């Protein structure tokens, strides 16, 4: 199965509020702040969702759980132009919005900002002989991609995200 078929709303974590459009931000000093590493979050999420490997499929499992990267220009969401939200393939948490997606020419879906300040976590990634900033799902720790300081706009950030790590939900017409 592909990532678009992977999200199961019955396993979606709705207990922890997330920041985003129309959702109040979480106070980072609040005692609900999750201080676990992405690896600890991934392990806990995988342990509590034993069907995750079957649900995600090989590429999404490799990218989200092993910090893998799909080949450039091969992702199913690279050319997605519809209005909607991009969710974590592993847990269903809202991560990015189509309003913030743009064509960076990199070969991966690119966004100027996450859907909310608490949607993603970032940390230094010094693997593969280079220093980058890794982006993970703040809710479950799934690897998403990397953020680079060469994006458009005032913040100048480019969130370069694997399609396999995302599920797209089209926004209904009003």
Spans of model-derived segments:
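A short Gly-Trp-Pro
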Residues: 36-174
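N-terminal targeting and processing segments of secreted/endomembrane and organelle-targeted proteins
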Residues: 26-39
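Residue-identity detector for glycine
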Residues: 20-22
């Amino acid at each position: 199965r592909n990532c678009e078929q992977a999200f199961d709303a019955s396993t979606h974590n709705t207990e922890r509020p997330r920041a985003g459009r129309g959702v109040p931000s979480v106070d980072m000093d609040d005692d609900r702040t999750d201080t676990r590493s992405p690896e600890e979050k991934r392990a806990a999420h995988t342990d509590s969702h034993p069907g995750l490997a079957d649900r995600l499929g090989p590429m999404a499992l490799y990218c989200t759980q092993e910090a893998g990267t799909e080949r450039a220009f091969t992702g199913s969401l690279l050319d997605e132009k519809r209005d909607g939200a991009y969710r974590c393939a592993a847990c269903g948490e809202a991560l990015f919005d189509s309003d913030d997606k743009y064509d960076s020419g990199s070969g991966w879906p690119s966004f100027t900002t996450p859907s909310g300040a608490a949607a993603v976590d970032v940390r230094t990634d010094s693997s593969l002989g280079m220093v980058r900033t890794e982006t993970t799902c703040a809710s479950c720790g799934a690897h998403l991609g990397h953020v680079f300081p060469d994006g458009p706009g005032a913040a100048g950030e480019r969130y370069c995200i694997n399609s396999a790590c995302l599920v797209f939900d089209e926004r209904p017409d009003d």
